[in-house]
Amino acid sequence: IYISGAFGKFILGGDDGVNDIIPPAPNDLISEEMYYTSKDGTADADHFLGIKNGDMANLAGNDNKITYMLPAMGGLSAGVSHTNKSAAGDADTTELGASYTMDAGGASIMIGGVTGTTENSTQDIDSQQIGVQISTGNATVVLAQSEYEADGDDEQGTSAGISFKVSDAMTLGAFTSEVEDDLSSEEYTNTGAEIQYTIASGLKAIINVEDYDYKAGTSGGFSDNGTASKLTIKATF
């Protein structure tokens, strides 16, 4: 649900907050990214890692929240999100973000950043991200850096992605990411590629291949590496 006007835009509900709306991220260029890990105890299973790329952690998930976006001011965009997790307020999440878009040398450049905090009884959970997006012709490149801090976590992530529209029917994408936890010595790297192909109007095939490596460090998890692939068929009506 949203309400918009000269005052800006209010968004209510379980949608993502400004962490997903504002800053550019390499994930935005890939339609069906997996960031795969296969064994128990790795980054997906027990969440030993709060981030797996250069994108900010989605601290509030799909919980109900209110987001306010300021009215457009030239190339500037800014907003705030708040998630009221409990009546006591001991697990609320607040996010602030801003971005600026400009033209330079025939390219469109966007620079954006976001920061968020979830209140916690032991140590607040904090995550930040800054990203740069450059678009020219049929190509778009995004570079991003993120951080995640919580009780027992001090993580830094970087990622880069590129998307190229070959034709009206085909788009190619690729990305690479790396995350390190200074406290547990965990490391996660992932490099992937994607092909999007429009078979017919409303019907699209998407092929993804990713190569990943997870080092558990002292986290108590299981180190893991491998290659994952996926075929997705999307139909829209």
Locate each region found by the language model.
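Outer-membrane beta-barrel proteins
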Residues: 1-237
